[in-house]
Structure formats: structure tokens, C-alpha cells
Swiss-Prot record:
Pfam families, alphabetized: DASH_Hsk3
Name by which UniProt lists this protein: Golgin-45
Organism classification: Eukaryota, Metazoa, Chordata, Craniata, Vertebrata
Coiled-coil segments on the chain, per record: 123-216
Keyword Phosphoprotein in annotation: yes
Domain of life: Eukaryota
Mutagenesis or variant effect for L403R: Reduced interaction with GORASP2
Claim: Protein transport is one of the keywords in the record: yes
Chief location: Golgi
Length: 403
């Protein structure tokens, strides 16, 4: 820490009282009272030197001025006093021990004796004082800069505190201006969000319109396909019905043909026995051959047997006698034949009309067809074929009536 002692010349106040001899044991003993001397760091002593006691206050009319005994008017220099404020953090305390105090005191005494012999130069002292003043001015300048920096920091901190106060007041809700600004910001944000939602809604409406158009297109396609499917279903139902009718007619024809074959077989046996019995005792002109393999062979065999019996019994009769026999015989179709003709007429009515214009017969009722055969394997004609039903079963007889 740098200290400065202000020297002030005064004609009336220039005498310092003599310093008493200190007692032994305090480390600052003096043999005789020396002359008053000012000791400063970096400044040469002026005039005679005196070591004052640190425990005794010096009486002075002006505080802050150290009286240094008798000072000559010729050698006095007036120095302006400048007060320096030093921060507490820059002060360091150095407490010397007892031995160091004694050594420094002895060394200081030798310096005082040597300096007393040297004659000081006023110009040199003036230059040194100027240097000290320059240093003090520099330190003052630095302190002013520090003060300015601290002032700026204080101003910034004050502004921050003001803003914090505003925020605190706004958070409490007592500031209507902040509330109005917040409402304005929220309104602007809501306007932007509303515009974005409006654009999204427009895009969604366009997509919805396109989707509705596509839905209409696919609905029309579906309806058209449904109509086509219904037509195909009806056509399939008709074809299935015709197929079942044709199958039933074929089965009926085959069953009738089987019955005719059995009857013709029995007729063949009867005719052969009759022909053999007629040739009894005579030369046999007929001998039984192998059994026929088809209905046509069976019919041909029966026809030959009938001719042989006819020739044996009646002989050779001329054509004139055959013409006398009435030939106006009207044949009727069997139920199976009628069913077959009906199926053919349904499948191709034009061809049936052209091929058999003279074959006109009354169609038999369904009751007649059902009574002639117990189960002809057909479906009921009035069903819709969702659930396939038969018009006959193994335990029932008669016609099924669709309600």
C-alpha cells in the first residue's frame, strides 16, 4: 500500500515537541531524542530526521498534516494533497517479528546518520515529488476508469432489475399493458393457426371431393357388375334347370328302354317256344341262335320269329290281303318321351317345330309324370335354387307344392 505524507509549510506552526525517550523492551528504544524526520517510500528525507513514536499522537491544528519540527522557509515546498481510496482487498498486512524490528531499527539509525551528513538538493526533491504526483495522477485515472466501469455495471444492473420488476408485475397480472401485449401475441398466433387450418381444410375438402367422385365411379361399376352378376345368375339358374330336365328325361328314356328290353326278351322266349312247338314232328326250319346284344338285335329277332310263326300258321299271304288291314293307328308318346320332347323344344324350339310338324301331342300334367315314376331326380320348378330342394324323397309319394 502506497502512503503519502503531505508537507505543508507554515511559519507559525513548524515546531514539533521533543520526542521522549522510550522505555526498554518495546523494540523502539532511542538513546537520545533525534531531530524530527519524515520517512516516505520513494521520497528522500527533507532537512533533519526524527523518528517519532508510533504510540503517541502528534498534536496538530489541521488533521492529516504531519509536523516535522523546524522547517526553513527557504526549503519548504507546497504540495497539493490528493486523497486516494484504496480497496480493502488490495491491503495486505505484514506483521514483523521482534528480531526483524530490532534489525530494521538499527539499519534505519545508520541510514539516518548517513543522511544527516548529506546535503539534499531542492531540485532533485522537486523532481521526485513530480514523479510521485504523476504516479498519483495515473492511479487517480485508473480509479476513475474503475469508477466509470462500476457505474456502467450499476446502470446495467439497474436496467436488469427494472426488467425483472416488469416481468414480476406482469406475472402477477397487475400490468394491463403486458396483458394487452400478451393477448395481441396470442391473437396473432391464433390467426396464423387459423390460416394453416383453413389451408388444411381446403386440401382435405379437395381430397374428399376426389374421393367422392371415385366412390361414385366405383359405385356405378359395382351396380353394373351386380346387374351383370344377377343376369349371369339367372342364366346359370336357367341352364341348370334345363340341364336337370334333360338329365331327368334321359334317365326316364333309359329306364323305359330297359323295361322294353325286358319285355322284348320275354316275348322272344315265348315266340321261340311257340315256334318250336309248332314245328313238333316236322322238319325244324328254325333253330335258336345266340342271345342278342342290343335292343335293336332283340327287336329284329322278335320280328323274324313273328314272321316265321305267321308263315307257319297263315302261309304266304299276298299284299292285297295286307292292304285290307286298317293302318290308321295313332301312337302316343310315353311320359319319358314327352319329357324329352319338351326339353328339346325348350332348348331349340325352331328345330323341334321344323323336324316334327306332324307330331302334335298333348303335354301331360306334372301329376301324370310324377305318378308314373316315383322319383325322376328333378328339382322343383318353382324354387329359387338358394337352397336346393327335391320334389320327391324316399319316404313320400306325390307332388311337392311350393307355397
Amino acid at each position: 500500500m502506497e502512503k503519502m505524507t503531505t508537507l505543508k509549510s507554515s511559519e507559525n506552526k513548524g515546531i514539533l515537541t521533543s520526542t521522549p525517550i522510550r522505555g526498554a523492551g518495546d523494540g523502539m528504544e532511542t538513546e537520545e531524542p533525534p531531530k524530527s524526520v519524515e520517512v516516505t517510500h520513494g521520497v528522500q528525507p527533507i532537512n533533519q530526521h526524527v523518528l517519532p513514536s508510533p504510540r503517541k499522537k502528534v498534536s496538530s491544528d489541521s488533521p492529516g498534516v504531519l509536523q516535522l519540527g523546524k522547517i526553513l522557509n527557504e526549503r519548504t515546498v507546497e504540495v497539493e494533497a490528493v486523497r486516494i481510496f484504496v480497496p480493502k482487498a488490495a491491503i495486505t498486512h505484514d506483521i514483523p517479528t521482534k528480531n526483524t524490528k530490532v534489525k530494521s531499527l538499527g539499519h534505519h539509525r545508520e541510514e539516518l546518520h548517513n543522511q544527516a551528513e548529506v546535503v539534499t538538493d531542492p531540485r532533485k526533491e522537486l523532481s521526485e515529488v513530480k514523479k510521485v504526483l504523476e504516479k498519483l495522477k495515473n492511479s487517480e485515472r485508473r480509479l476513475l476508469q474503475d469508477k466509470e466501469g462500476l457505474s456502467n455495471q450499476l446502470r446495467v444492473q439497474t436496467e436488469i432489475n427494472r426488467e425483472l420488476k416488469k416481468l414480476l408485475v406482469a406475472s402477477v397480472g397487475d400490468d394491463p399493458q403486458y396483458h394487452f401485449e400478451r393477448l395481441a401475441r396470442e391473437k396473432n398466433q391464433l390467426i396464423l393457426e387459423n390460416e394453416a387450418l383453413g389451408r388444411n381444410t381446403a386440401q382435405l375438402s379437395e381430397q374428399l371431393e376426389r374421393m367422392s367422385i371415385q366412390c361414385d365411379v366405383w359405385r356405378s361399376k359395382f351396380l353394373a357388375s351386380r346387374v351383370m352378376a344377377d343376369e349371369l345368375t339367372n342364366f346359370r339358374v336357367v341352364l341348370q334347370r334345363q340341364n336337370r330336365d334333360a338329365q331327368s328325361a334321359i334317365q326316364d328314356l333309359l329306364s323305359e328302354r330297359e323295361q322294353f328290353r325286358q319285355e322284348m326278351t320275354s316275348t322272344q322266349k315265348f315266340l321261340e317256344e311257340l315256334l318250336v312247338s309248332l314245328q313238333w314232328g316236322r322238319e325244324q326250319t328254325y333253330s335258336p341262335n345266340t342271345q342278342p346284344h342290343s335292343t335293336a338285335d332283340l327287336a329284329l329277332t322278335n320280328h323274324g320269329l313273328a314272321q316265321a310263326i305267321h308263315a307257319h300258321l297263315l302261309g304266304n299271304v299276298g299284299i292285297s290281303h295286307q292292304k285290307k288291314i286298317p293302318t290308321t293307328v295313332e301312337f302316343c308318346s310315353t311320359p319319358a318321351e314327352k319329357m324329352a320332347e319338351k326339353v328339346l323344344r325348350i332348348l331349340d324350339p325352331v328345330a323341334c317345330t321344323e323336324s316334327s310338324p306332324d307330331n302334335q301331342f298333348a303335354e301331360s300334367s306334372p301329376t301324370t309324370l310324377l305318378t308314373t315314376k316315383k322319383n325322376i331326380g328333378r328339382f322343383h320348378p318353382y324354387t329359387r335354387y338358394e337352397n336346393i330342394t327335391f320334389n320327391c324323397c324316399n319316404h313320400c309319394q306325390g307332388e311337392l307344392i311350393a307355397l
